[in-house]
Amino acid sequence: MTASSSDACDPHAEARMASNAHLPAARMAEVVREYGPYPGAPAVHGVSHDGDRVWAATAAGLLAIDPASGEVQRTLPCAADAGTAFDGRHLYQIGDSQIQKIDPQSGRVVGTIPAPSGQGSDSGLTWAEGSLWVGQYRDRRIVQIDPETGAVRRTIESNRFVTGVTWVDGELWHGTWEGDESELRRVDPADGAVIERLALPANVGVSGLESDGAGLFYCGGGNSGKVRAVRRPKQA
């Protein structure tokens, strides 16, 4: 993911400010808890939630974290350099330009498909509506793919790097991280228009995003090695 830098040293900062001018005003995100860093896991590349545990993609593989205690309950060794997803039965993990389908009980890889970019720019990953949704940070887009074949079903464009993606209650959210600025954005799945923005504190990156299906988002924290729980806004 993108390394932190100040806007004074960022040649794209002015362009980002211009592209954000027509967007809804950002509100500050409410970070309610931080987890980690954990031994042997200096960076978090993706996150998911299986209804009970938070899964974090790290150099050590997938860590299953108890969200109440913050303790690591299990580690599944696998290539894990980007997004993570859960379909109710299997985990999906981006690693080495592939998406691995993993049995969380045994840790066995039961299938693989090519990651859509094939160039290491796939980042966020989530499961919804019978599809995998892949954030592509360099290409600034989200692609919906067939989980069996990897075929692209549709593409949603963004004006920012996409570093995490999740669906919750019919809402599509994605994480962004450019320079020292990170946000969580709710977007219209029909055309990608930004509906809502939550700004993370300066120098807090987002590398992976998932909802717990209730009141929280979980965000990977890149090279901080942390996972952060962020309050999900209540909708009217």
Regions found by a protein language model. Name each.
Residues 66-70, 103-107, 146-150, 188-192, ...:
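Short loop/turn segments that connect beta-strands within beta-propeller blades
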Residues 17-41:
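A short helix->beta-strand "capping" segment at the edge of beta-propeller domains
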Residues 55-60, 91-97, 134-139, 174-179, ...:
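Conserved beta-strand positions in repeat-built beta-propeller and related beta-rich domains
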Residues 206-236:
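Blade-level signature of beta-propeller repeat domains, shared across WD40, Kelch, NHL, RCC1
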Residues 162-168, 174-183:
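Loop/turn-rich, solvent-exposed surfaces of beta-rich toroidal or solenoidal domains
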Residues 63-64, 100, 143, 185, ...:
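WD40 beta-propeller blade core
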Residues 30-38, 71-76, 108-115, 151-156, ...:
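A short beta-strand motif characteristic of beta-propeller blades
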Residues 38-51, 78-88, 116-129, 159-170, ...:
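Beta-rich, blade/repeat-based domains predominating
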